[in-house]
Amino acid sequence: MLLSRYIDDDLRECGCDEAGRGCLAGPVYAAAVILPADFSHPLLNDSKQLSEKQRYTLRPVIESEAIGWGIGIVSPQEIDEINILRASFLAMHRAIEQLPFRPERLLIDGNRFDPFEQIPHHCIVGGDARYRSIAAASILAKTYRDDSMLRLNKDFPMYGWERNKGYPSPAHKSAIRRFGVSPHHRLTFRGVVDADRPTTE
């Protein structure tokens, strides 16, 4: 299915989406993307509907053809301080701040958002499967976050982040019980806060 713009006009329409909200470890990432009005690509869809190979194929296309794009990151420590919902909004704000110019309309994937500098915004549940700019943002947020978890995995291979990317898989939760938490775990998250102490050999 070919995705569309939210409104067919001349306003600079910016799609925003986050990745990593439900993870036990690692930062939350967000992306903000402004696409040309005539942008189209047959593979473009919600990142969750694409294979890893398709996401990484699309990323350079989005980056090269977008009018502007930005990435925002919020650390696990910040997430623990302000909660994951506010952290997701903050990541989107930081992504928008990275854009080369101010958008005129924000499209937010989801049902809530903290307004940014009085720019009109529209919250759309499932927007990443309906609108091009949100789908593009979902792909950038997902791939950049996956890259960050692969880097973190080099120092903490026991948690299997190269496979689970920080999500609460059975193997990840088992590793937390066995090895304890890392500096990259979200200490206020269920599944981390109730983990057992490390086993002693």
From Swiss-Prot:
Its main location: cytoplasm. GO terms for cellular component: cytoplasm; ribonuclease H2 complex. It catalyses: Endonucleolytic cleavage to 5'-phosphomonoester. Residues 11-201 form the RNase H type-2 domain. Manganese or magnesium. Binds 1 divalent metal ion per monomer in the absence of substrate. May bind a second metal ion after substrate binding. This is Ribonuclease HII. One of its GO terms (molecular function) is RNA-DNA hybrid ribonuclease activity. Its cofactor is Mn(2+); Mg(2+). The gene is rnhB. The lineage of its organism: Bacteria, Pseudomonadati, Bacteroidota, Bacteroidia, Bacteroidales. Belongs to the RNase HII family. A divalent metal cation binds at residues 17-18, 109. Its EC number is 3.1.26.4. It comes from the Bacteria. Pfam families: RNase_HII. It is found in: Cytoplasm. It comes from Porphyromonas gingivalis (strain ATCC 33277 / DSM 20709 / CIP 103683 / JCM 12257 / NCTC 11834 / 2561). Disulfide bonds: none annotated. Endonuclease that specifically degrades the RNA of RNA-DNA hybrids. One of its GO terms (biological process) is DNA replication, removal of RNA primer. Keywords: Cytoplasm, Endonuclease, Hydrolase, Manganese, Metal-binding, Nuclease.
